[in-house]
């Protein structure tokens, strides 16, 4: 649900990953969150929470984010066995403004490994509630899997440490459900 607030957008967007638990201690705005693939900054890589969320393959997992500083855009969710296997930030189209180049749009990926969902919660106005969805966890066994949530920011000049996206991750221990079809080979 979005309001019709017509206030000028802030220069920076921020969000907190509320569910599942973030891998890094986040402040009230969600920082540190700039660097891909999972947040941190050059000056502050972040303090690990050591949080691990246990889930069963083939089951639903609730994702909740709180956009603490508004910027128009959308979100993407991805999953990989290791952080270095998470997808790169989306390709971005920019346009010239009187303040210099600004992001206009980002490529939205089709949901196939490692991307679970993209183009989530597209918005041009300040949200009035937390963003929530449920994803189906792949029926795999994976200790230490990395669930990534990124926010693409439109009408943004970009930041040196994160381009046009902010990043959060959660660590999942996934146990395949033997009652469901065999592990999906695309997630190997």
Segments (PLM) and residue ranges:
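C-terminal segment of classical bacterial N-terminal signal peptides
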Residues: 5-11
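Structured recognition/catalytic domains enriched at protein termini
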Residues: 13-188
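Short, small-residue-biased leader/transition segments that mark boundaries at the very start
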Residues: 1-3
């Amino acid at each position: 649900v979005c309001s019709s607030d017509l206030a000028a957008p802030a220069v920076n967007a921020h969000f907190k990953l509320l569910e599942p638990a973030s891998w890094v201690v986040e402040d009230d705005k969600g920082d540190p969150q700039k660097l891909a693939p999972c947040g941190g900054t050059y000056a502050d890589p972040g303090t690990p929470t050591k949080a691990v969320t246990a889930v069963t393959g083939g089951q639903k997992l609730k994702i909740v984010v709180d956009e603490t500083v508004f910027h128009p855009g959308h979100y993407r969710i991805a999953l990989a066995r290791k952080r270095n296997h998470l997808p790169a930030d989306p390709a971005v189209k920019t346009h010239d403004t009187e303040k210099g180049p600004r992001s206009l749009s980002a490529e939205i990926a089709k949901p196939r490994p490692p991307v679970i969902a993209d183009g989530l919660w597209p918005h041009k106005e300040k949200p009035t509630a937390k963003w929530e969805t449920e994803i189906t966890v792949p029926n795999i066994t994976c200790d230490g899997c990395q669930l990534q949530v990124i926010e693409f920011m439109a009408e943004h000049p970009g930041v040196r440490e994160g381009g046009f996206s902010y990043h959060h991750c959660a660590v999942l221990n996934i146990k395949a459900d033997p009652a469901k079809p065999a592990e999906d080979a695309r997630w190997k």
